[in-house]
């Protein structure tokens, strides 16, 4: 347990509860220089202490009892003092002037199993947890305990240090430990069930004591608390802090840390590419969604920008700023996004407030559509009054058009069409397309693209990204063909028109358990930029954008050739975790040809890409990782027999394998090799002879600019 070097004042409002007496008794037993201090004595004696600790278990009726002493607390912090607020006391941060957004859950938890703090790996060097070798810190194992936490909202000024672990289960959406940098002072709030009155198992008692001592010591030592980055330099420092931890890709875009999902608001403005994305600054889990932001001059080298959109505590996006798009409204960059509030999700508008698109002004009359259309049986679920979200907007024939993703009760997924003269008043035109599927299906993140000879409509149906090729006639989509955009770990893509090409990015979700994502400190990546088009046969084409070649940092092979016989495996003179492989394959008389990447020297760990005589391209993940917590299923896509010989581009990036077959078919897979030496590449054949008529390989460089 950390030794306390400073003087601690235990705050109370005149009398001590049983819980408070137990905390004082524990504090005295640590040998700390400590004494109780009533609120009334704060003006006279508060300055004698290095740390003030308010530990309150009882409910607060009305105004916080410490609110009348906010001035003394402010002065104490201004002189460099530290303040610890535990249990329900953390709910008073707004009354004390520390925070503008208080915890949204203040309650009594019935604790029946070891529960406590789920510490963020990003801050595993925080002095409060210096004595721990685990991020999971139980502090209570039974009893009814008063708690405070952030669930649907985040503190505006503070930084989340920990969420909740309960009975061995991570509960990241319950955020219970927060730090505030009140330079030169500091505040730590511990709303977890930090109970001293109830006896606990020896191990739980030890971790409770160590965490409390650690927080008090960190505050007594005058350590500044971590703060959420507010500018580009801060975001870059955040990225550098996490580094390439736990398989983080180096040239596929990821958030600086924490959570990333759907790409949003893709736009080229003043010659620069902007990618916004769904981002949670509180950790690597889906909750309290903001819009992250990055810029690039070439689509492959990125610079982190400040968070662009944050939920407004009293607005229609209180619970999250969800997916949407960006358009140029006569010279004004404009976002249309889904705002979440309780069980409601509706479209909101924001306009750029600076040329760099770093700050945005939300429309005062948001939401711009106040309800789903009358007479349409939009699906309702346990989570939402109406599944009605995600927006694609374009201008045609002098009017704005918008499609919204939804599901129709007993019918399936659907895309609804609206029109507007000004982006603010919208008229419902009817369903653009309704699926033929299960009645509980929702089509998310719809997008309608103009590919010249054809229009492409794609939707994400919780599992895959389905696309339809055809045209729009009288406000309805005519389907001429359909397919799957990517047959692997790929979801919710969004596109931008860049001259005469359509460039698309998709979200690459993780394929490992929640605990592994938490421990890594990051989650989610974006695909490489893809150019979508149709070929002379009217079928969809997909290829990496030409700019991807700019990542090439050194060539390992140049149009090499080799053949492999039945049962033979040949190691190639290529290795690494950031690679591009460009191959021409022919099965000859073999049943299969295998390309293995991220392979250990003994072959026990490898990701195998298998091309079969039946016209399938398969990613076999059964040996891809020694980690039992990752997904190990096999992914496959049809590659029609006339595609032989096969042209294959394979991009390897730590935990990403992204495949392009004949510029038509895509499969992106998430894999997590555990061995440092799993960097090899080999080929093998079964059932006969196979040939690589051309093989080129490059090492690829990092995709970030600081």
Language-model regions, residue ranges each:
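Aromatic-Pro/Gly-enriched surface loop or interdomain linker
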Residues: 1-51, 224-226
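Structural motif
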Residues: 11-16, 39-40, 54-58, 86-89, ...
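Catalytic beta-strand/loop cores that center a nucleophilic Ser/Cys/Thr
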Residues: 19-21, 25, 30, 109-201
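A glycine-rich, often tryptophan-bearing local segment used as a flexible ligand/cofactor-contacting loop or short
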Residues: 58-140, 211
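Surface loop/turn signatures of beta-propeller and other carbohydrate-active proteins
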Residues: 228-264, 283-286, 300-328, 357-395, ...
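Beta-rich accessory regions
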Residues: 235-239, 466, 472-491, 496-706
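Hydrophobic core segments of beta-strands in well-ordered, beta-rich domains
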Residues: 262-282, 306, 322-351, 368-369, ...
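Conserved Ser/Thr-centered positions that define the repeating blades of beta-propeller domains
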Residues: 296, 352-354, 417-423
């Amino acid at each position: 347990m950390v030794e306390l070097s400073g003087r601690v004042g235990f705050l109370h409002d005149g009398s001590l509860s049983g819980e408070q007496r137990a905390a004082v008794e524990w504090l005295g037993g640590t040998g700390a220089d400590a004494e109780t201090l009533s609120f009334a004595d704060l003006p006279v004696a508060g300055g004698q202490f290095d740390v003030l600790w308010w530990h309150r278990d009882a409910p607060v009726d009305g105004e916080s009892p410490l609110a009348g002493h906010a001035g003394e607390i402010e002065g104490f912090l201004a002189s460099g003092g530290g303040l610890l607020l535990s249990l329900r006391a953390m709910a008073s941060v707004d009354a004390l002037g520390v925070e503008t957004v208080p915890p949204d859950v203040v309650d009594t938890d019935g604790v029946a199993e070891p529960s406590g703090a789920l510490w963020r790996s990003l801050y595993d060097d925080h002095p409060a947890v210096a004595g721990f070798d685990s991020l999971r810190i139980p502090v209570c194992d039974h009893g009814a305990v008063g708690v405070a936490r952030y669930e649907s909202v985040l503190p505006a000024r503070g930084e989340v240090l920990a969420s909740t672990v309960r009975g061995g289960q991570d509960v990241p959406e319950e955020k219970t430990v927060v730090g505030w940098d009140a330079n030169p002072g500091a505040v730590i709030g511990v709303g977890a069930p930090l109970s001293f009155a109830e006896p606990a198992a020896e191990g739980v008692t030890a971790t409770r004591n160590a965490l409390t001592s650690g927080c008090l010591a960190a505050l007594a030592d005058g350590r500044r608390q971590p703060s959420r980055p507010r500018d580009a330099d801060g975001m870059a420092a955040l990225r550098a802090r996490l580094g390439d931890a736990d398989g983080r890709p180096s040239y596929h875009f990821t958030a600086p840390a924490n959570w990333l999902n759907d790409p949003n608001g893709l736009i080229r403005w003043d010659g620069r590419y902007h990618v916004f994305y769904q981002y949670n600054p509180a950790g690597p889990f889906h909750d309290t969604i903001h819009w992250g932001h990055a810029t690039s001059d070439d689509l492959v080298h990125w610079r982190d920008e400040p968070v662009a959109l944050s939920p407004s505590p009293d607005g229609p996006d209180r619970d999250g700023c969800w997916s949407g798009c960006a358009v140029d409204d006569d010279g004004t960059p404009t976002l249309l996004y889904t705002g979440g509030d309780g069980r409601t999700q509706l479209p909101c508008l924001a306009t750029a407030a600076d040329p760099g698109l770093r700050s945005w002004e939300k429309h005062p009359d948001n939401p711009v559509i106040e309800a789903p259309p009358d007479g349409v049986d939009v699906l309702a679920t346990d989570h939402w009054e109406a599944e009605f979200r995600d927006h694609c907007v374009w201008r045609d024939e002098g009017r704005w058009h918008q499609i919204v993703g939804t599901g129709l009760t007993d019918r399936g997924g659907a895309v609804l069409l609206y029109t507007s003269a000004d982006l603010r008043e919208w008229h419902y035109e009817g369903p653009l397309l309704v699926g033929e599927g299960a009645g509980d299906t929702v089509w998310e993140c719809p997008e309608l693209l103009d590919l010249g000879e054809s229009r492409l409509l794609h939707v994400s149906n919780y599992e895959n990204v389905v696309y339809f090729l055809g045209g729009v006639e009288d406000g309805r989509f005519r389907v001429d063909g359909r397919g799957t955009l990517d047959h692997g770990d790929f979801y919710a893509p969004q596109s931008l028109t860049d001259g005469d090409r359509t460039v698309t990015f998709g979200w690459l979700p993780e394929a490992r358990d929640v605990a592994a994502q938490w421990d890594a400190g990051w989650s989610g990546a974006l695909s490489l930029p893809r150019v979508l088009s149709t070929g002379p046969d009217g079928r969809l084409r997909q290829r990496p954008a030409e700019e991807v070649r700019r990542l090439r940092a050194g060539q390992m092979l140049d149009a090499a050739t080799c053949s492999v016989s039945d049962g033979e495996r040949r190691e190639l003179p290529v290795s690494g975790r950031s690679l591009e492989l460009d191959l021409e394959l022919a099965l000859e008389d073999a049943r299969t040809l295998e390309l293995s990447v991220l392979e250990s020297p003994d072959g026990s760990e490898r990701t195998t890409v298998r091309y079969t005589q039946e016209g399938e391209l398969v990613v076999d993940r059964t040996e891809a990782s020694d980690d039992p917590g990752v997904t190990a299923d096999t992914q496959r896509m049809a590659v029609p027999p006339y595609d032989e010989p096969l042209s294959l581009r394979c991009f390897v990036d730590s935990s990403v394998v992204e495949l392009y077959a004949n510029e038509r078919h895509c499969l992106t897979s998430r894999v997590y090799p555990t061995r440092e030496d799993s960097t090899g590449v080999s080929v093998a054949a079964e059932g006969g002879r196979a040939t690589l008529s051309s093989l080129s390989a490059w090492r690829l460089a990092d995709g970030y600019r600081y």
